[in-house]
Amino acid sequence: MARSIWKGPFVRESLIKKVNKLIESGKSSVIKTWSRESAIIPLFVRFVFAVHNGNKFIPVVITEEMVGRKLGEFAPTRTFYGHAADRKVKRK
């Protein structure tokens, strides 16, 4: 079930503070976060977030097309190694 519209998007306060601090200083550095559930807002465009996937931090460059989605959507948590090969010996 989706979040109701009247509540607005959820964004962790610490992320907004970190982005505002970078804007004021004029620097561009990677913002580390564990907040995969935070929505991407227009303020985040052109910043680089290091989103934790449960094992390591995945760098995500925010573009305008990503606005409205969640940070966790761009840091996959599972690694797909492919399906197991058929191990039956084929005789001729």
UniProtKB/Swiss-Prot annotation:
InterPro entries: Ribosomal_uS19 (IPR002222), Ribosomal_uS19_bac-type (IPR005732), Ribosomal_uS19_CS (IPR020934), Ribosomal_uS19_SF (IPR023575)
Keyword entries, A-Z: Ribonucleoprotein, Ribosomal protein, RNA-binding, rRNA-binding
One BP annotation, GO: ribosomal small subunit assembly
Origin superkingdom: Bacteria
UniProt-recorded Gene Ontology molecular function terms: rRNA binding; structural constituent of ribosome
Cellular-component GO terms for this entry: cytoplasm; small ribosomal subunit
Family according to the record: Belongs to the universal ribosomal protein uS19 family.
Function: Protein S19 forms a complex with S13 that binds strongly to the 16S ribosomal RNA.
Name the UniProt record assigns to this protein: Small ribosomal subunit protein uS19
UniProt lineage: Bacteria, Pseudomonadati, Pseudomonadota, Alphaproteobacteria, Rickettsiales
Gene: rpsS
